[in-house]
């Protein structure tokens, strides 16, 4: 089942720095100037993460550039943004990220089929240095394999 997604931003570092154990989709509360800026593709979620504040989940460090035509109605570029999730999902997430070593990272931000902005989140556990080295070796080996196959 392929679903339409127009990707705005992708967090490649998260896949290298974390083991992603579970993925989920969340809506996000945005202002009008933020949506216009996202339509131009001016967003970065490289350092972003999500955290709970009681019964809500917020996305921190997500950079959405200012929309130049918004004048005085512009938004703060790195403000915390509320994520829209069902209560069951929030309780499940809070239970998982309260365990030592787990965090909630933003993997990608995209427009869905109905033109709503969605954020793909991952419940993740941090990699150690030797795990990162291992993933680099695997990536290099796959690249070498594909080169060998193309040469034949």
UniProtKB/Swiss-Prot annotation:
A GO CC annotation given for this chain: cytosol
GO terms classed as biological process: trans-translation
Primary localization: cytoplasm
Record carries keyword Transcription: no
Gene3D superfamilies: 2.40.280.10
Annotated InterPro entries: SmpB, SsrA-bd_prot
Keyword set includes Metal-binding: no
Compartments reported by the entry: Cytoplasm
Pfam families xref list: SmpB
Similarity-based family: Belongs to the SmpB family.
Physiological role: Required for rescue of stalled ribosomes mediated by trans-translation. Binds to transfer-messenger RNA (tmRNA), required for stable association of tmRNA with ribosomes. tmRNA and SmpB together mimic tRNA shape, replacing the anticodon stem-loop with SmpB. tmRNA is encoded by the ssrA gene; the 2 termini fold to resemble tRNA(Ala) and it encodes a 'tag peptide', a short internal open reading frame. During trans-translation Ala-aminoacylated tmRNA acts like a tRNA, entering the A-site of stalled ribosomes, displacing the stalled mRNA.
Name recorded for this polypeptide: SsrA-binding protein
Protein species of origin: Rickettsia peacockii (strain Rustic)
């Amino acid at each position: 089942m392929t679903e339409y997604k127009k990707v705005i931003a992708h967090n490649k570092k998260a896949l290298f720095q974390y083991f992603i154990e579970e993925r989920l989709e969340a809506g996000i509360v945005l202002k009008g100037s933020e949506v216009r800026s996202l339509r131009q593709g001016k967003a970065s979620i490289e350092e972003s993460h999500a955290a709970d504040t009681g019964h809500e989940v917020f996305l921190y460090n997500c950079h959405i550039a200012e929309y130049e035509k918004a004048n005085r109605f512009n938004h703060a570029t790195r403000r915390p943004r509320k994520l829209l999730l069902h209560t069951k999902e929030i309780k499940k997430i809070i239970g998982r990220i309260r365990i030592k070593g787990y965090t909630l990272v933003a993997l990608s931000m995209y427009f869905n089929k109905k033109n709503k902005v969605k954020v793909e989140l991952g419940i993740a556990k941090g990699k150690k240095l030797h795990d990162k080295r291992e993933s680099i070796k695997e990536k290099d080996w796959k690249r070498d394999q594909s080169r060998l196959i193309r040469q034949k």
